[in-house]
């Protein structure tokens, strides 16, 4: 192997790394999880105005997007966002950034079906298999709630497993009283709920 050594003053060599390369936004992945032999994650796409989509890699290595164009899997709960999707046997339930409502998709690319009414935001969803329900952190942004309390109210709620033709469901309140909630989880027997909470 014949290599010629080149000596140059410090800082005068031509680097393959450019300022453009360092400042250009790249695709980012978050909220990685596995479900029934597949891997799922949220993918942020700067070229699509930061839209976030749910991606899946199945057991044989096929990668596909679940999220149709013009949908954005992202939540505004606590202003920082958080986990914006939950997987269960019937597909995926996700928070859509534009209106913060929960939507259900049965299969990749299928039309999302609205599950919740306007005026609420949801995050940190969990599939409670023992009780066949979904558990979420919910922020109540309804004008009547904000008027009564002076700000939105945070709660942990249970939402029925989606089914065709079911009415919109804002959720049954399980826990309330603190300023913030995160990471609600139910044990396998379905008789204990744990979460993180904090106040201003």
Report the location of each language-model feature.
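Conserved beta-propeller blade repeats
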Residues: 25-38, 72-92, 119-134, 176-194
